[in-house]
Amino acid sequence: MPMPDELASLDGQVAPAAQTMIPVTEEGFLRGDGVFEVIRVYDGVPFALDDHLTRLERSTTNLRLGWSARRDELEQDVARLLDARGGSDFDGCLRIVLTRGGRRLLITEPLPATPEHA
């Protein structure tokens, strides 16, 4: 079964990224207020995930977003999304976005094509 180029997880629910919707009334969307990390994924394993999540926690604390107690949810979201994306068959990027409105958005993206050298 072919996979869409991008899958997303919004608050733990996995779906094609194009079908994932955030309400326009969401405070993080309205104010442009949140934090994000982009993580390289090799064979279904996010590189330095612990370091990235630590940085996200630090950023949410600095902005007073109140996310420090939800690390376990993020770890579960990451595992569920990467499993849906093909597990060890997936090489690409994982973007994690946390908003002031309390949303957890994770998106998988394929690696951009590299140009051919003549």
Where are these regions (language model features)?
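Conserved alpha/beta cores of soluble small-molecule-handling proteins
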Residues: 1-118
